[in-house]
Amino acid sequence: MLVWLAEHLVKYYSGFNVFSYLTFRAIVSLLTALFISLWMGPRMIARLQKLSFGQVVRNDGPESHFSKRGTPTMGGIMILTAIVISVLLWAYPSNPYVWCVLVVLIGYGIIGFVDDYRKVVRKDTKGLIARWKYFWMSVIALGVAFALYLVGKDTPVTQLVVPFFKDVMPQLGLFYILLSYFVIVGTGNAVNLTDGLDGLAIMPTVFVAAGFALVAWATGNMNFANYLHIPYLRHAGELVIVCTAIVGAGLGFLWFNTYPAQVFMGDVGSLALGGALGIIAVLLRQEFLLVIMGGVFVVETLSVILQVGSFKLRGQRIFRMAPIHHHYELKGWPEPRVIVRFWIISLMLVLIGLATLKVR
């Protein structure tokens, strides 16, 4: 929005030309989202406390979590607000990739909001019925994927980028829609499963978003895309603004979500952020890179799948409790130790993922 305004004002003052620089807009996008999140934090927490929107804690969970009962939840609203405002201010409104991310972010946020509302207001511990949650998540994911396929069919938009192989970029055809669906829905649920400890989900989200900001910049730059042997996508550059907004909003939220948390993001935040990371990976053609950089989310999800599968097939559990972060809690690890170690692993995986762009 401000970019368009600056383009009209630059004829009166050349200094407005700075708004056309992607690097400048990426920095101010991060700062804008950060300050909005920090400003909203105390007000949001006070409002949630007044409304008695407190966290519901399972009785069969770790005993250390009982003290979290009643902590304000649905704080993801301030994350989404900060991201959306920052993106609308600093990204080109005409960029279709930006709108794809916003559709998934807001759509999944609404689904998460309904789920949280049923849990904390109606006191329904199950929240939104699972089949309806997956139905609406699927509708959004398939709608966006199908639209992208129609526009980018038989172009680099629908190619699959395979790590370590610079000349292996097969056209996916209709499989593109199916892959995109699983990436978007899967990442949304993966981040949701990871959001079980104070700050555990938000920091890996920040790391992955920061990594994708660098990838988006390279993908939207023809010279760097050719140098790294990745598809050049002319709309990808504006995703830098989206990614830095996620980083800023996430850091602002972490200020209040760090142990011991003053507020939790709830499903409204975790589903939306996960969905956003998923669609960003799809738009950049870096689904494999998401698996590497978002390895913490992948392991958390696999731990649940293995736990459920093992119990149904063998009647035995693999972990003391799933997702796996609860397993380490029950082994006696203090919560901050689990959180920080998962952060360190996440940062390492993002750096490894970025390194794969050059190792081809």
Swiss-Prot record:
> Which EC class is this protein assigned?
transferase
Q: Which cofactor does it need?
A: Mg(2+)
Annotated localization: Cell inner membrane
Pathway connected to this protein: Cell wall biogenesis; peptidoglycan biosynthesis
CDD domains in the record, alphabetically? GT_MraY
Keywords for this entry? Cell cycle, Cell division, Cell inner membrane, Cell membrane, Cell shape, Cell wall biogenesis/degradation, Magnesium, Membrane, Metal-binding, Peptidoglycan synthesis, Transferase, Transmembrane, Transmembrane helix
One GO molecular-function entry:
UDP-N-acetylmuramoyl-L-alanyl-D-glutamyl-meso-2,6-diaminopimelyl-D-alanyl-D-alanine:undecaprenyl-phosphate transferase activity
- Could you tell me which residue ranges are on the Periplasmic side of the membrane? 1-25, 93, 153-167, 220-235, 284-287, 359-360
Show the catalytic activity. Answer: UDP-N-acetyl-alpha-D-muramoyl-L-alanyl-gamma-D-glutamyl-meso-2,6-diaminopimeloyl-D-alanyl-D-alanine + di-trans,octa-cis-undecaprenyl phosphate = di-trans,octa-cis-undecaprenyl diphospho-N-acetyl-alpha-D-muramoyl-L-alanyl-D-glutamyl-meso-2,6-diaminopimeloyl-D-alanyl-D-alanine + UMP
Q: What is its EC number?
A: 2.7.8.13
GO cellular component, alphabetical, reads: plasma membrane
Per the UniProt topology annotation, the Cytoplasmic ranges are: 47-71, 115-131, 189-198, 257-262, 309-337
Q: Which InterPro entries match?
A: Glycosyl_transferase_4, PNAcMuramoyl-5peptid_Trfase, PNAcMuramoyl-5peptid_Trfase_CS
Instruction: Report the record's Gene Ontology biological process terms.
Output: cell division; cell wall organization; peptidoglycan biosynthetic process; regulation of cell shape
Name the membrane topology term. Answer: Multi-pass membrane protein
Q: Which chain regions cross the lipid bilayer?
A: 26-46, 72-92, 94-114, 132-152, 168-188, 199-219, 236-256, 263-283, 288-308, 338-358
Please report a single Pfam family linked to this protein.
MraY_sig1
Quote the function comment for this protein.
Catalyzes the initial step of the lipid cycle reactions in the biosynthesis of the cell wall peptidoglycan: transfers peptidoglycan precursor phospho-MurNAc-pentapeptide from UDP-MurNAc-pentapeptide onto the lipid carrier undecaprenyl phosphate, yielding undecaprenyl-pyrophosphoryl-MurNAc-pentapeptide, known as lipid I.
Please give the family membership noted in the entry: Belongs to the glycosyltransferase 4 family. MraY subfamily.
What NCBIfam families has UniProt attached to this entry?
mraY (TIGR00445)
The name on file for this protein is Phospho-N-acetylmuramoyl-pentapeptide-transferase
Look up and give the organism this protein is from. Answer: Salmonella paratyphi C (strain RKS4594)
Recall the taxonomic lineage recorded for the source organism: Bacteria, Pseudomonadati, Pseudomonadota, Gammaproteobacteria, Enterobacterales
Gene encoding this chain?
mraY
